[in-house]
């Protein structure tokens, strides 16, 4: 009788309570398109590996504090993986602490596989003092999101308005290019 009661009580537990999920960000490609007014559109392409599931969404911390999410955010499975998910909308919710909640707009969430998350947001780099004139040079800064579990591959592409000289990276000993604690916290 005890075994029967235990089996009956297990049957009453919702199936989702049995689920487990692991996820890891495998790569990030961020493209920062800056206009002459100092406004930028940041395009994020995150490759995320998922085991188990379902994964209904996740939080990304360290996004620009003034970020304004743009429409048409999507997720799709990466070709050649176990998952076969068509292009699916994402719901983005920017929080005041610089966290971006990314929800998959799909009842079943995401199960084991590798997925590409594509989303964009606007930010004002000039207003946040992340574009600075230093003599005849102009310095552009951008701090990307933080990945608490680490990341295998990260790349940032800056697209800047044309100028008289091509962009360069600052010398390692120069005062230009130094990052202070405010920048490390998202601005």
Predicted feature descriptions by range:
Residues 2-11:
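Bacterial N-terminal signal peptides
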Residues 14-187:
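Lumenal/extracellular ectodomains and adaptor appendage modules
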């Amino acid at each position: 009788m005890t075994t029967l009661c235990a089996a009956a009580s297990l049957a009453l537990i919702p199936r989702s309570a049995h689920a487990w999920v692991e996820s890891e960000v495998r790569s990030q490609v961020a493209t920062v398109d800056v206009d002459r007014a100092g406004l930028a559109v940041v395009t994020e392409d995150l490759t995320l590996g998922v085991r188990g599931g379902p994964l209904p969404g996740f939080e990304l911390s360290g996004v620009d504090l003034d970020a304004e999410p743009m429409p048409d955010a999507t997720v799709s499975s990466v070709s050649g993986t176990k998952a076969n998910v068509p292009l699916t909308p994402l719901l983005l919710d920017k929080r005041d602490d610089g966290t971006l909640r990314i929800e998959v707009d799909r009842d079943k969430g995401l199960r084991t596989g590798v997925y590409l998350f594509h989303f964009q947001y606007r930010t004002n780099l000039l207003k946040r003092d992340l574009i600075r004139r230093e003599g005849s040079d102009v310095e552009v800064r951008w701090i990307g999101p933080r990945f608490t579990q680490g990341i295998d591959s990260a790349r940032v592409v800056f697209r800047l308005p044309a100028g008289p000289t091509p962009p360069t990276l600052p010398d390692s000993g120069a005062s230009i290019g130094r990052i202070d604690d405010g920048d490390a916290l998202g601005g």
